[in-house]
Amino acid sequence: AFENKLMKNYRFLGISTSSEGYITQIIGPVLDVAFPVGKMPNIFNSFIVKGQNPAGQSINVTCEVQQLLGNNKVRAVAMSATDGLMRGMEVIDTGAPLSVPVGEVTLGRIFNVLGEPVDNMGPVEATAKSPIHKPAPAFMDLETTVSIFETGIKVVDLLAPYRRGGKIGLFGGAGVGKTVLIMELINNIAKAHGGVSVFGGVGERTREGNDLYMEMKESKVINEENISESKVALVYGQMNEPPGARMRVGLTALTMAEYFRDVNKQDVLLFIDNIFRFVQAGSEVSALLGRMPSAVGYQPTLATEMGCLQERITSTKEGSITSIQAVYVPADDLTDPAPATTFAHLDATTVLSRGLAAKGIYPAVDPLDSTSTVLQPWIVGEEHYEVAQGVKQTLQRYKELQDIIAILGLDELSEQDRLLVARARKIERFLSQPFFVAEVFTGSPGKYVSLNETIRGFQNDFTGELDSLPEQA
């Protein structure tokens, strides 16, 4: 009976292709679609709803299959607004997951979750496309040796080094220099490693995405005169997008990064801003699909969804994807399931401090709060490890003395402590450096400092060789 009713609907709609279905229910961004017997799409297949709304405007909505409901029905999540969709509308199964353009043509351009350019600079002549759902690299293909990813930024390389193919959490409020740090990393990976970057804007403010784009053009990270010389591809799925788009935009950015790693054999930087919004979008979709919520209202599949994204970010024998992820901590609660699940995947954390930014020390990376799992003597070497520990001990002691200095003044300290404070203040200044991308704002030429140079410089500072120099030197 169901089949006869279905075929009558098909004849009424004039549908001829066997992979076509029709909408039976719409609840916000979630659609139920009926398909002919034996023509059910697979989970994660994308399908397209085409037609016209009552006002005569054309509709083209891409959806992704999330559940097979039985009775030849599937439940899918829309990747764009569902305004104007009606029951009975025609649905065409593409027979494959969502595929996006990859390769050099993506550099300097802005894409949405579907891989469509949204920067009003014309179509992208893509020679290759890649599906956004893929397995993580096989165990045999992974790079097993742990190596440091040199950034040319002193404070990062010395005290909280990044692992090549690792994941780094970036913590910091508004106005402490997150964007400038991100742009400097994009610039340095292009110059020092011959690599490229992909920036995924996940569920953040559209204004911030626009500001980042404008600043990248100003600092020549995106080259307007010769777009192919740009060093970054941008993929945006901002706050105004439906939850389906925000949940998948991270995978679109990752797919573009994987092509540079696997086919071009390059080192790639993948930025995700903000990884919490990826979890939040997944939570919204989970509720819309009718799943029972887990702890604090999050989706029961939280760890699986996070793992599917994070496990694809790694070093292989061909190249590497090193990921820097901005992490929003809701209500500053580190035990919240979203940040707690993220922390399990991170190799390092870079914490930006408002106090250092207020002193005018940039990059405002907090040397004591930032951490790294690769700061071990058998990975970075004894010399690097000892210098880093010495710098941290000096800064920690300075932090402990700050209350005494504030109440009694510097003169009440012992001779040894006064010397330590002088060294700590020099170290604090020495941890700052001018950035290439900030040249247009500061007028100071940028500096890329190699790791060996950084270690040697701090060794001199911390052994007392520079005690005779003033702090400003």
UniProtKB/Swiss-Prot annotation:
One of its GO terms (molecular function) is ATP binding. Pfam families: ATP-synt_ab, ATP-synt_ab_N, ATP-synt_VA_C. One of its GO terms (biological process) is proton motive force-driven mitochondrial ATP synthesis. ATP binds at G172, G173, A174, G175, V176, G177, K178, T179. It is a peripheral membrane protein. It catalyses: ATP + H2O + 4 H(+)(in) = ADP + phosphate + 5 H(+)(out). GO terms for cellular component: chloroplast thylakoid membrane; mitochondrion; proton-transporting ATP synthase complex. Keywords: ATP synthesis, ATP-binding, CF(1), Chloroplast, Hydrogen ion transport, Ion transport, Membrane, Nucleotide-binding, Plastid, Thylakoid, Translocase, Transport. SUPFAM superfamilies: C-terminal domain of alpha and beta subunits of F1 ATP synthase, N-terminal domain of alpha and beta subunits of F1 ATP synthase, P-loop containing nucleoside triphosphate hydrolases. It comes from the Eukaryota. Belongs to the ATPase alpha/beta chains family. HAMAP family: ATP_synth_beta_bact. F-type ATPases have 2 components, CF(1) - the catalytic core - and CF(0) - the membrane proton channel. CF(1) has five subunits: alpha(3), beta(3), gamma(1), delta(1), epsilon(1). CF(0) has four main subunits: a(1), b(1), b'(1) and c(9-12). NCBIfam families: atpD (TIGR01039). Produces ATP from ADP in the presence of a proton gradient across the membrane. The catalytic sites are hosted primarily by the beta subunits. This is ATP synthase subunit beta, chloroplastic. It comes from Equisetum arvense (Field horsetail).
